[in-house]
Amino acid sequence: MKVRWLVNENFPAPSVAIMRASGHDVLSIAESHSGDDDVEVLALARKEGRWLVTFDQDYGELLFARHYAPPPAVILLRVPSYRPEEPAVWLEHLLCKPNGLLGKFTVFTGTTVRSRPLLHQSAT
């Protein structure tokens, strides 16, 4: 499965470069849509069929409390301290089971991975 990524503005540029060098299709909000709010980022991920990767916990509220329509998958990275290259390594590790992430909101803490199904509802 070829994943198309949308990495949020808070995703480190060195990890974007590593992922692209490994052949991944990565759209970086910091490079092309800087300043877009979370709702716009979510809509872009959904429109382009990209998996959203973020360090921003607000997406959980948008998807589960406010019922915005989800993209194919969301990966929330909740690691308090890391080197800028590490997120690319984490995503490679998570891709070992990509079908286990599809249709899910996944939280990666550095030591644990938790997923819950995304609720496919109409956009708010």
Protein language model annotation of sequence segments:
Residues 60-94:
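Mid-chain, well-packed structural core segment of small domains
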Residues 3, 98-124:
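Charged phosphate-binding loop/patch that engages nucleotide di/tri-phosphates or the phosphate backbone
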Residues 45-63:
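Acidic, metal-binding active-site segment of PIN/NYN-like and related structure-specific nucleases
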Residues 2-50:
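N-terminal first-folded block
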Residues 16-17, 38, 62-65, 86, ...:
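Short glycine-/acidic-enriched loop or helix-start segments at secondary-structure transitions
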Residues 27, 53, 75-77, 106:
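Hydrophobic/aromatic beta-strand patches that form the interior of the parallel beta-sheet core
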Residues 19-22, 41-42, 66-69, 90, ...:
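Short, glycine/charged-enriched secondary-structure capping and boundary segments
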